[in-house]
Amino acid sequence: MGKTHGMGAARKLKSHRRTQRWADKSYKKSHLGNEWKKPFAGSSHAKGIVLEKIGIEAKQPNSAIRKCARVQLIKNGKKIAAFVPNDGCLNYIEENDEVLIAGFGRKGHAVGDIPGVRFKVVKVSGVSLLALFKEKKEKPRS
């Protein structure tokens, strides 16, 4: 069957278009309002307090413990796991530190072999984690 033709077909064409719109991924994303239910609630970054440092086991076939931090977001109190990049950067993070969290790759999906981790740590106590790692800056005494 093709689309309806004729002078009286406008209502049918319009309603069909309206129902078919929901098959479009980007339309659905912008109109369902699910963006506000996610931890970041529509923003690109969020600040949080480190609750604990955790090690998450990598998925098969890899064998490693990926260093992460359990963080409670300040804006809404949600608890998330955030990956700590670079070798030894977990040493710059203490419990109760304020950290800046960003998304981690694949538009809300976990990246690579780290199951369930969708965010990464960018700053610790207002200082870039990369700057701390390269020893260009020091973490402020709190």
Swiss-Prot record:
* Keyword presence, Secreted: no
GO aspect biological process, one term: translation
Instruction: List where Basic residues composition bias occurs.
Output: 11-20
Source organism, top-level taxon: Eukaryota
Q: Which GO terms describe its molecular function?
A: structural constituent of ribosome
Recorded hits in Pfam families, A to Z, give: Ribosom_S12_S23 (PF00164)
Which residue ranges are recorded for the region named Disordered? 1-30
Q: Which UniProt keywords apply?
A: Hydroxylation, Ribonucleoprotein, Ribosomal protein
Entry-linked InterPro entries: NA-bd_OB-fold, Ribosomal_uS12, Ribosomal_uS12_euk/arc
Kindly list the GO CC terms recorded for this protein. Answer: small ribosomal subunit
The residues that cross the membrane are: none
Composition-biased stretches (Basic and acidic residues): 21-30
Q: Which residues carry this modification: Hydroxyproline?
A: P61
> What family does the entry list?
Belongs to the universal ribosomal protein uS12 family.
What PANTHER family does this protein's entry cite?
Answer: 30S RIBOSOMAL PROTEIN S12 FAMILY MEMBER
| Protein name stated in the entry | Small ribosomal subunit protein uS12
